[in-house]
């Protein structure tokens, strides 16, 4: 479908649905068609001229059903938008079409004992504000939790804060079920339990429309946020590693930031020296007493300490200096930087971190996040900053990591599989075939769909009771 055909289809849909909340002004549509893919100079260039033809914000499921029916009737692409905090162009329309702002579907549906079910458009911070008085909090969330939506986390995210305990969002037990709308002439609404629900996780909204997500929660703790500094990188790494591997220390977040990364945190400058390395931790109040001994052992110093309540009141949480917020703070100071995403081996991540830091020197700056993997192993992932020169050199850096047994989750590509070692998953494509048979959801993002005729696809990938 070319641009003129899309404009004609859009005009017919608007004429049929005039009461919906439309955004048609070109500058606003372009702005709403953007996320944080500009962290990557490669994606920034590739996606520069990509945008939707219109944006619409449904107020409820009934309006969304009308939109889906209309888009299927006119074969117009439909792309879902949450908080637009993604980093890989997850929401950027490759073939124009309708961008659906899901933030109108923002209600808590149910809160139980350690379980919450909410609509996809709700912000993660709003979920926690609701669950906290009942003694619960999210198990894992990105550093963008104040803006990011639940559906965006599910469809385009990984995990983040809390993953030191519960692993990534897709680890068994974190997601309990999802409610999904199909992209069909007569849309169906399906309840899909885990583990089948995870076939729609991190699929960029390309194989189903997430309406609700049911999550297991974590017990609420009185958290202390700390930033401790070290003169020696190995001391900082050893401190963070000891912290991570102490099961009795109750924690929510743990990140290692090599110099000069802490100096990019302009709001914290003056608390430490520019050449010092930092460890940011979020630790339960009852466990904080152990920090003093660990700091003394590894020659560290306390630079910032605040309670989580103080951080919320000031809108100044140290959690917003971790994960890809680190990259954002750095880019505000030095726009020539970019980053890579690495996954170290849980059996020897400590040595790998040291070796790779020594190998690249100042060209690649260590930003390490500690977490559990899906099997429960304590390990480390990196969002290392890179002094960007050329795309060729950036690719060489990623190859070097791989050659040293460090996995790369490439953040400089927009197709789902290319960010995950290039692996096409037939089961994910099968779900798209069943829930989006015309291929209208976020077209171009799922490479497996382009080669679906060469794959052996499951006739019932979700084990649906009506099939």
Predicted regions and their residues:
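FAD-binding subdomain of flavoenzyme oxidoreductases
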Residues: 109, 124-125, 129-248, 458-467
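A conserved active-site cap/scaffold subdomain adjacent to cofactor or substrate pockets
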Residues: 260-305
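Glycine-rich, acidic
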Residues: 238-268, 303-323
